[in-house]
């Protein structure tokens, strides 16, 4: 059975089962990777899942085994990539988790002292081990308490930037007291049903929580403009898109839940703070009532005191310190350890976020949820938010979330247009991944295209000719198709790419294209990049201005100083831009600054 014969011979030596596709993998293929017990307990559902993929012309291998380490799996994936044009894989059940160290320069925000902090906490769970074949790692050992965790240093002679060869997703059951194999069976049945829908991406919600983007309205409102560029026409119709912000309600949690429960909702993106067990939806509401504000402060003091007690700290000493600092008396701390006040404060706190226990009753229906947040996708945990979403009884089938903390000053909407054009989630993620980002759920899920003549999945898996992408760059009216063309030409080191990127930045009407040009030029770090930065500080798109000022500060070239000062004088109402201006000015001697 084609390449499967050779692989099958290898598999028995390792105690593995490999089932070759029923279709010959000519243009592309996919791998369903599972552990032996999950294969035995969920075989009908896994085979049904494979069948629906093959109906979509995606031949799928099944790789089942008692995996001893991540290298076993990676070797098979690399072989399928060479022999059968593998485009991606999904990990179902108990699949080894690479815990990456010495790679914090490749994360967007995660920084922790690897010498002083516990190894479990200071490592990044990352499936880039599996899907970026060029990365090299030095094996450190298996975790002593969790058999799934394997620690690696990023090797000194490894590439120090990501460029994924395939995509991956994880379907890892929760340890929440329910049968883990029934979770997988139910999920795969839901995923198969989702594949059989003819569902166009035309119902979208964005929610921005308290603290995101420094609560800047200027930064928040730009997302609406960007999405209209990426999905032209889709959101011009009434009620197809909704942009929600924490400040629209005192307690927005119920509004968010109502959105998640919509039967017709295709996609929801959260911009918020997070932990594995919680989404921080909002904070204490603003008030002009002194008595109400006083009660909010007392609740905060009670909460902080409980934290001190939980950590076996000096409660009396902390109260004395606060009384001195804030000129308070001890009545401000009254009830901190009273059961009735603890109950009341807990109820009040529950209004501010979505926690693990909330998700089953919410039963989210949004087919695809993006968590632009820290830790919501931390799959090393026994239970975590993104996992709860996909294993719920609702119609949510896939999430995109981060395993550690993540930077706010990054583009969260890259290449969204490809999702609307019917691209598999995994193929989209392959070009937007960072070290900590992961697909939780089925990476082959896609929306229907709704546009004649657009075969994005084939384009991304088979079209490597520069001529193809040059034609798309020249002729396509769609901003994100132009973006992908620029990215492909950049990766292929197309002659003159730097000048092409600068020209496109100077002439494109699309903010998303201009940002792509600037970010790719940053990797080249040439004179064109510096000239584009000077133009970028007055771009209509706030995010471009924000990032341009930040990069000027990192470079610290004297030629940038007049542009930074001009921005300080003229763009002071853009909070995030202004913050970056003040930070950038620290790179310059005070004697050079004249305002």
Where are these regions (language model features)?
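Bacterial Sec-dependent N-terminal signal peptides
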Residues: 1-16
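Structured catalytic cores of large enzymes
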Residues: 7, 71-250, 259-267, 276, ...
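Loop/turn elements at helix/coil->beta-strand transitions in domains of secreted/extracellular proteins
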Residues: 27-29, 56-60, 84-88, 199-204, ...
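Catalytic cores of nucleophile-dependent amide-cleaving enzymes
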Residues: 123-186, 295-411
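Caspase-like cysteine protease fold
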Residues: 412-496, 512-515
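Structural detector for internal amphipathic alpha-helices that build alpha-solenoid repeat scaffolds
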Residues: 458, 480-493, 512-525, 545-557, ...
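Short inter-helical turns and helix N-cap capping residues of alpha-solenoid HEAT/ARM repeat scaffolds
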Residues: 477-478, 509-510, 540-541, 572-574
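Conserved small/polar residues in nucleotide/adenosyl-binding loops
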Residues: 593-595
């Amino acid at each position: 059975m084609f390449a499967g014969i050779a692989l099958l011979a290898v598999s028995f030596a390792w105690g593995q089962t490999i089932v070759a596709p029923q279709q010959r993998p000519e243009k592309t293929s996919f791998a369903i990777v599972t552990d032996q017990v999950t294969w035995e307990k969920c075989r009908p559902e896994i085979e049904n899942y494979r069948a629906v993929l093959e109906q979509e012309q995606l031949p799928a291998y099944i790789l089942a085994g008692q995996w001893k380490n991540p290298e076993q799996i990676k070797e098979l994936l690399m072989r399928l990539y060479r022999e059968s044009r593998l485009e991606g894989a999904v990990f179902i059940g108990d699949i080894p988790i690479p815990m990456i160290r010495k790679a914090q320069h490749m994360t967007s925000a995660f920084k922790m002292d690897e010498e002083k902090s516990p190894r479990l906490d200071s490592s990044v769970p990352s499936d880039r081990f599996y899907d970026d074949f060029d990365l090299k790692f030095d094996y450190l050992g298996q975790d002593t308490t969790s058999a799934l965790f394997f620690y690696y240093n990023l090797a000194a002679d490894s590439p120090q930037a990501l460029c994924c060869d395939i995509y991956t997703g994880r379907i890892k059951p929760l340890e929440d007291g329910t049968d883990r194999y029934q979770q997988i069976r139910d999920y795969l049945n839901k995923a198969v049903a989702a594949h059989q829908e003819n569902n166009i991406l035309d119902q979208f919600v964005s929610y921005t929580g308290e603290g995101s983007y420094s609560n800047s309205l200027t930064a928040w409102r730009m997302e609406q403009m960007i999405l209209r560029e990426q999905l032209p026409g889709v959101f011009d119709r009434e009620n197809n898109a909704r942009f929600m912000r924490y400040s629209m309600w005192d307690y927005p949690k119920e509004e968010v839940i109502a959105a998640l429960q919509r039967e017709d909702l295709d996609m929801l993106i959260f911009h918020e703070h997070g932990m594995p067990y919680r989404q921080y939806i909002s904070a204490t509401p603003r008030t002009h009532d002194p008595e109400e504000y006083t009660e909010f402060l007392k609740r905060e003091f009670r909460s902080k005191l409980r934290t001190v007690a939980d950590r076996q700290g000096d409660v009396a000493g902390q109260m004395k310190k606060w009384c001195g600092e804030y000129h308070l008396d001890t009545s401000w701390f009254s009830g901190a350890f009273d059961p009735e006040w603890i109950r009341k404060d807990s109820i009040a706190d529950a209004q501010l976020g979505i926690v693990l226990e909330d998700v089953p009753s919410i039963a989210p229906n949004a087919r695809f949820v993006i968590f632009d947040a820290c830790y919501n996708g931390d799959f090393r945990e026994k239970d975590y938010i993104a996992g709860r979403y996909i294993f719920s009884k609702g119609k949510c089938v896939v999430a995109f979330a981060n395993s550690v903390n993540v930077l706010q000053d990054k583009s969260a909407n890259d290449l969204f247009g490809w999702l609307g054009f019917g691209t598999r989630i995994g193929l989209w993620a392959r070009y937007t991944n960072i070290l900590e980002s992961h697909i939780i759920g089925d990476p082959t899920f896609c929306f229907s295209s709704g546009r004649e003549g657009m075969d994005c999945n084939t384009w991304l898996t088979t079209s490597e000719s520069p001529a193809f992408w040059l034609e798309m760059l020249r002729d396509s009216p769609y901003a994100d198709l132009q973006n992908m063309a620029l990215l492909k030409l950049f990766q292929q080191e197309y002659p003159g790419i730097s000048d092409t990127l600068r020209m496109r930045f100077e002439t494109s009407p699309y903010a998303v294209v201009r940002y792509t040009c600037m970010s790719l030029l940053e990797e080249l770090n040439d004179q064109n990049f510096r000239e584009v930065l000077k133009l970028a500080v007055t771009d209509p798109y706030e995010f471009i201005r924000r990032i341009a000022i930040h990069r000027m500060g990192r470079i610290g070239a004297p030629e940038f100083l007049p542009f930074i000062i001009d921005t300080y004088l003229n763009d002071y109402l853009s909070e995030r831009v202004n913050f970056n201006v003040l930070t950038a000015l620290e790179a310059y001697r005070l004697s050079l600054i004249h305002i």
